[in-house]
Amino acid sequence: KPQTTRHKIVGIDSREKSQAVFVDTPGMHKKEVRAINKMMNKAASSALRDVNLVLFVLDADKWTQNDELVLEKLKNAEMPVILVINKIDTLENKNHALPLIQERAKLMNFAEIVPVSALRGANLDHLRNTIEKYLPFQPPLYSLEQITDRSERFLASEVIREKIMRQLGEELPYDLTVQIESFKTEEATINEKTGRPKPACTYIDATIFVYRSGQKAIVIGEKGAKLKKIGMDARVDMEKMFEQKIMLTLWVKVKGGWSDDERALKSLGYSDI
């Protein structure tokens, strides 16, 4: 969904002969009204100073004011910019793909233009090969097994937030955040009474903060149905991610004004760097 990334997140793609480190930034916000918007803009802008290559990702089916804002920033970039046109498979007429690419090519002097479908995995290998051409020759920055620089607590909060977005659609685009209150792992042991192995298990307690009580009711749903579904889906994904049993407990609390309070933002794990 658009405008859902709030943190600068590093993803690591290690291949046989290369390692690409992706910095997924929050989108730019034209109206810097709330503190969270200002922090997100700073995070996006600061990333441009530290990278060797920029991927400018656009949807094939639309052009937004925020796209225009990012484009103006990129025109002054000192590094190559690759235009990635996503959702190319959504075009009703496939003959419109080439004219679209030609039209987008006029936006600025792109180093490359690569159409893809992230959902279907179409042309992603070509994109990876294209990126590889622009990587500097140097030793890997991360171990080959590492896929991100973020903690397990952060990844857990992002999984929960993603499931909330999927359940609620556009009802709560910015007015919620997730805080991991407790993250404890019990290693695998042997049950003293039965002698049977007890698998490792991670116990996660998380709070979903919303602005208003009406939003709390939306997240919980009738008889708790939505919150239960969010928890179940998040637990399934976490068990795949962490490769162990997960016990997840969710609460929903009202915390008005959190997105315009810098102290509250920092206490919830937000940063402008």
Q: What is each model feature region?
A:
Residues 5, 29-30, 63-64, 91-92, ...:
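Catalytic P-loop NTPase motifs of RecA-like helicase/translocase cores
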Residues 1-13, 23-26, 243:
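Short beta-strand-centered segment that lines the nucleotide-binding/catalytic pocket of NTP-utilizing
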Residues 13-20, 38-113, 184-199:
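Conserved C-terminal guanine-recognition region of P-loop GTPase G domains, centered on the G4
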Residues 12-16, 28, 47-54, 61, ...:
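Conserved, well-folded catalytic cores of nucleic-acid-processing
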